C-alpha cells in the first residue's frame, strides 16, 4: 500500500553520544531515515544530543533538538511539537529505552503519539529476556538453558499502585490541572527510583543465588535492555558470578539478568532481516563470527556472507529468523537475529534479536549496498518492499529482491586497551571495541589481509607476534593459552602458533575457531614461508597470485627484506594492478549506475580481469577519510569528510570518497559521487588515484579532514606527484616539528611554555633536569594525546621512560633489538622524539578554530575549557563563547591565530590550543587541519565551516566560500551559549582510574545549548548521562590551594538545601568560614569512611581535587565508587563551580527545549 497520509509529523530519536556499543552507525541510520521521510513530505522532528552527527545538521530535519535524550526532556519536546508518530528504531538502545519509558510514563497516550517502526509490545518481547524465551519456545526454537534473576513480582505491585494513583488523578482533574497533577505524580515516582532499585536488586540477587545451583558454572550473564552487553560477562567461579550479577542488575533499567548455560566455543551467526506489514520478508545478509561464542559480536571478527554453513543449515536458519520476526511482532523494518550452532552435534539455538537497525545492520548495508535504514523508515510509514526501488541498481530491481553478493566482506574491531592502563584485554560478552574496519575482496584471504592493514595499528598483514610466557619453558601450553584466550591479537597468535609448528587440528582444539578459517590462515603462513625462502616472483602471474591472497606491498617487502617502494616498482614493471568491482546488490546480474567500489586482484578462469571503475571525465577531488574509529579520531572527522563531499558537489566537482569504516555516513553510497571502500594505506590510495587520473582532471586530494590517518599519507602522495589541496604537507610538518615550529614562534614574537626535545633516553633525563618538574611529555606525531603524561617527579619520569615508552615500540624494532630495551627506545626516539613542556598549573586552556585562504583568515570560534590546562582538549568540557576571558584577551587570541594562519599559509581549517596564565598567553599546539571541535563550532555559530573550508581548499577565496553558505558568521551577535561535554567508557573497564590527564580517553561528546550558561552546562551533563541531584549531600575534599575557591559552590549548594560532608582539613576550613558540615574519614583513616558512604548512597555529589601522586592514588577508590554508583564527580574547581550553578538553575526552574533552528532566527 502507499504511504500513510494520516501522519503528518514524525519524531526521530537519535542515539546520543558515541559510546562503546553505540557509535557512528546510528548517525548513518538516522541520517538515512531523516532524508527518506523528508522526501516523502513528512515534517521531521529530531532529537539528538551529539553535535558531531550529520543528522543534527539544521537542513536535515524541520526541527532539530540538540537536547539530552532523557524521557523527561523528550516529553517536553513532544509537548511542544505534538508529533503524530515517533520512530524509535534508528537510535540504538538509547532510543528504544527512551520510547518505552515515554510509553510507561503515559506521555505517548497523553499526546496521542503513535509508535511506528516497532510497537512497544514487540520491543518488550524482544528485549525482555523472559518474554523472548517464551516466544521462542512457542515457535519451537531452542534457546540456551537458563534462569532469570529479577524482581518482576514486586515491580508489578509497585506499578499497579502507581497506575491506581494515575487513575484517581485522571478522575479528579481535567485540562491544565490534569497535566500539572500528572507531572507532579511522575516527579514523585522518579524521585523514588533509587529506593525502588535497591529493593529490586536485593530481591533479584536472592533469585540469582537459586539460579546458580541449577545452571552451574561457567555461566553467561546477560542483562535485559542494555547496550553492547553492558554489565554482562562470563563467570567461571562464584565470586565472579555475584560480581557480574550485581553489575548486570545495576546496568539493566529493568533490574533483570538472564543466567545461561555455557555455550562457549559454539559457532555464532547473525541474520539481517527486513519485513514489511504485508509479511514480505527478505534476508539482507548472513554474517558469521570467526570468533566462537563467548565474545560479544561487536568485538568479534565477522565475515559476510556466512562461509561455513551448508545450504541446508542456511535455509533452516533463514526460515527460523523470519519466524522469530513474525512471533516477536516486528511488523516493519530491519532486525538482527543471532544464532549459535554446536559444532559437535549441529544443535541450533537462538541467542537474541534486536528489533531495530543495529551495528550489524550498518555492516550488512555496507556489505551488500542495500540501504536497510532508508528502507526500514519507508516501511514504517506504510510502504511495502515491492513498492520501493533499489537505488543501487538505479531502480532496475525492487527492494523486495534479496541481495546477492559475489565477494567476501571481513570486519575486524579496533580496541583501545592501551588508553586504559590496568584494564584486562580479554574479550567477553560485554563489548569493549571502540571502532571497526571493513574490507572487501574476491576471496576470504584477500578480504582478511586487507582488513588487517586497514586497522591502522601498524600491521601490514599477519605480522609476527611474540607469544606471551613462551620463554618460561612449557612452550606448548603457552601457545595453547595464547590462542585459547580471546584477545584483540588472537588471530595473529593463531598464525604465530602455526609458524611454531601447531597443526590446524591442534589450533582448533585450543581456540574453537572453525577449521575452514584456520586452513585459510595456514595457507597464508605457508605462502609466507615460501616467499622468505625463494624471494619475490619475477613474473606477473605468480606476483598477481600473491596479491590475490591479499598480501600488501609492505608485507611482501618485510618478508623479503626490501622496501615497499621496490615491490610497487616491480608490480608497475610487470603491470600487476588491481581492478575495481562494484557493490551492486545483485552479483552483476543487473548493471549498476552507483559507483560503490572495492579493489581486487582476482584471476578469472578465462580472459583478463575486468574493471568496473568506469572513470568519468569530470573535474574531481578525492577525499581521504579517517578509517576505523578510535579514541582521538572519531565521528567529528567523518562529519568533516561528509561536509567536504557535499560542498564539492555544490561547487560542481566530482567528489570521490576513500574510507574503510562501515559505521559512517561517509561510506554511504549517496554521500559522494564515487566511493572506494578501501584501506587507507599509501599503496591502496595510490592505486585508486592511478585509475582516477586516466580520465578527466584530478584537481587534488584532501588530506586535512580525516584526522591523522590521511595526514600520514601526505608525503607519499606528494612524492608521487599528486596535488594536495589546502595547507601544504610542509606546513603541516612545520607545525608538528618542534624545532621548526619554535623558530616560527620566535619570528612571530609569540610565547610557548619552556620546552625541550629528546632523541634518546639519556637526553630525556637531561631535558627534564633542565626544565624542572612538573612536566608534560609526549611522543611527536600523535593524535589523541597517545602516551602523553604529566610527570611530577624523577620517579614518574623513570616509570614513563621504562614502562610507557616501550609500549610504543613497533614490532620490527623489537625484532631488531630483541633483548636491548634501551636500544629499542633510542631507535624509536631517533625518528619520533619525545617532546617536553613545562606544565602550566592553574592555567585556562582555550581552543580556537579558524579558516584561512592563505591570505585572509576568520576565527570561527574561541572555546574556553572548563577544565584547566593539562587535561586533553578532547576530554575537556568547553564553552562557546568564552565565559571568563576579557575582551582584550579574546582580541589578542584572534590576532595571534591570524598571524599563525598567515605564516603557515593555511588553506582551509586550523586549530590552535592556547593556555592563559596570569593574563599571559602561551601557545600549546597548532594543528593546520580539521579538529574535533569543528562540528560543535559549526552548530553553535550556525555556519557549515567544514563546507566553507572545502571550497577554500578547492581554490575559492574566504569571502566567496562564505558567500556560498550565507556569509560570515557573527559569533558575538548570538546570545546563546553552547557547552561541549565529553563522554567516557570507564564503566566498561573495571579497575581503571577515572582521573583525567593529557592522554585522551573519551569516546564521544554531547552539546548543551541555552541562553543561560548554567542551564547549558546542566543540559550537557544530562546529555552525557550525569544525573545532577536537586537535593541531598555533597562530599567535599580539596587540596589546600582550592579551599578558598570551593567556598563559593559549597555555599551555593548549602543555600538551596544541600547537606555538606567533608574530610578533616576541608571540614575545618568550611566550618571556620561559616559553612556547616559533617566530618567523614578518608579511606586511609579507617571505617566508616567516604567510600562506604558513597556505596550506601548517603552522598549524591562529589567535589574532590588532589595534588600529590599519593593523594591521587589514595582517592582512586573514591573515583571508582562514584562511577559505579553513577554519582556526579568533579575533580576541578571550574567543574565544581559550574555544577553548583547548574543545580541551582535546575532547582529554580525547569529546562526549556528549543530547536537549533530557533537560535538562528532573527
Curated annotation (Swiss-Prot):
Chain positions recorded as Mg(2+) 3 binding sites: 913, 925
Domain MGS-like: 1026-1162
Transmembrane segments: none
Cofactor: Mg(2+); Mn(2+)
GO cellular component, one term: cytoplasm
Keyword annotations: Amino-acid biosynthesis, Arginine biosynthesis, ATP-binding, Ligase, Magnesium, Manganese, Metal-binding, Nucleotide-binding, Pyrimidine biosynthesis, Repeat
Binding site residues for ATP 1: 129, 222, 228-229, 261, 263, 268, 294-296, 338, 352
Binding residues annotated for Mn(2+) 4, in chain numbering: 925, 927
EC number: 6.3.4.16, 6.3.5.5
Residue numbers binding Mn(2+) 2: 352, 354
Residues binding ATP 2, per UniProt: 778, 838, 840, 845, 870-873, 913, 925
Binding site for Mg(2+) 1: 338, 352
Annotated protein name in UniProt: Carbamoyl phosphate synthase large chain
Organism field: Brucella melitensis biotype 1 (strain ATCC 23456 / CCUG 17765 / NCTC 10094 / 16M)
Cofactor note: Binds 4 Mg(2+) or Mn(2+) ions per subunit.
Record InterPro entries: ATP-grasp (IPR011761), CarbamoylP_synth_lsu (IPR006275), CarbamoylP_synth_lsu_oligo (IPR005480), CarbamoylP_synth_lsu_oligo_sf (IPR036897), CbamoylP_synth_lsu-like_ATP-bd (IPR005479), CbamoylP_synth_lsu_CPSase_dom (IPR005483), MGS-like_dom (IPR011607), MGS-like_dom_sf (IPR036914)
GO biological process: 'de novo' UMP biosynthetic process; glutamine metabolic process; L-arginine biosynthetic process
Region of interest called Carbamoyl phosphate synthetic domain, as start-end residue ranges on this chain: 614-1025
Entry-linked PANTHER family: CARBAMOYL-PHOSPHATE SYNTHASE [AMMONIA], MITOCHONDRIAL (PTHR11405:SF53), CARBAMOYLTRANSFERASE FAMILY MEMBER (PTHR11405)
